[in-house]
Amino acid sequence: ELERSRGNKDIDWIVVCMHQTAVSTGNKTNGADLGIRENWLPLFDRFNVDLVVCGHEHHYERSHAIRGTLPTDTLTPNPVDAQPDSIDTSKGTVHLVIGGGGTSIPSNTMLFPEPRCRVLMSVGELNPATGRKTPNYIEEAAPWSVFRDRENPCGFVAFDVDPGRPGASTTMDATYYAVSGPFGEVRAVDRFRLTRPRTDR
């Protein structure tokens, strides 16, 4: 599907929606998943995926554009564009964790103080007391991290796409709105713009 979409001149943007994450700065939460980094990130690079939207973690955070991985056991995603708010996705894929749509267990207060990441490397034997397999984690630095909402447990992202003109670029403006208070006060907390050349160039 990714190959067909990227080869279609009528499609500019490729957005992947999935549950678990390749990136997360949550501590004592689910964390990032090595299996996703091994199996999915190379596909996202190969087919120039623009944006990956995940849940699983119950907070909001955003990565720099990433392409490839650093030479670590955890396959740390490699940030390729230091621009925090205007990102050319032809250089790399931006990852969003949007997990604050409504949960009884928010994780925004469980983020590492500095950008770090726990990566699920494998699972061990079944623990009869819990009925679950024991997860094995490795902690790493998170150079890919650009924005984390530590204050607000609930929120959503609105996207506005401008197709642009033939032969030029197309843009996707995104705004993360935090929702708080007993009356659902909505406040913009993070804004960024993705750009890419149109495929009809």
Task: List PLM regions with ranges.
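Metal-dependent phosphoesterase/phosphodiesterase active-site architecture
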Residues: 1-16, 21-30, 34, 38, ...
